[in-house]
């Protein structure tokens, strides 16, 4: 029983700290190329271009969990919009998170 309680406490601590998810930027490149580059390479619909540090800085400051959540659920802001899962409903949440990690890594 004590192992279960310990595991539950560790899991809860990870969720609260925001580090419950690990993203794989290398795996995210394939998803970016297939599903994200159309907008994030050109700036279509106000999407921040990958590599544009000034455009990405305030987004990165929100934290990965916020960026990934908005990318999964969709978001409409004053500078543009992000359709849920980039408009590709077949993407898994993990694929979206990995693609976001790739874009963030290229934009720091």
Curated annotation (Swiss-Prot):
Pfam families, from UniProt? Cytochrome_CBB3
The stretch of residues making up the signal peptide is 1-22
Keywords (alphabetical) are:
Electron transport, Heme, Iron, Metal-binding, Photosynthesis, Signal, Transport
In alphabetical order, the GO MF annotations are: electron transfer activity; heme binding; iron ion binding
Kindly provide the PTM information from the record. Answer: Binds 1 heme c group covalently per subunit.
User: Which residues bind heme c per the record?
Assistant: 36, 39-40, 82
Q: Name one GO biological process term.
A: photosynthesis
PROSITE patterns referenced in this protein's UniProt entry, alphabetically: CYTC
Reply yes or no: does the keyword Iron apply: yes
Source domain of life is: Bacteria
Please verify whether the record's keywords include Acyltransferase: no
Purpose of the protein: This basic c-type monoheme cytochrome has been found exclusively in the green photosynthetic bacteria, although its role in bacterial photosynthesis is not established. It has an unusually low redox potential compared with mitochondrial cytochrome c. It is reactive with cytochrome c oxidases but not with reductases.
The protein, known as? Cytochrome c-555
Q: What is the lineage of its organism?
A: Bacteria, Pseudomonadati, Chlorobiota, Chlorobiia, Chlorobiales
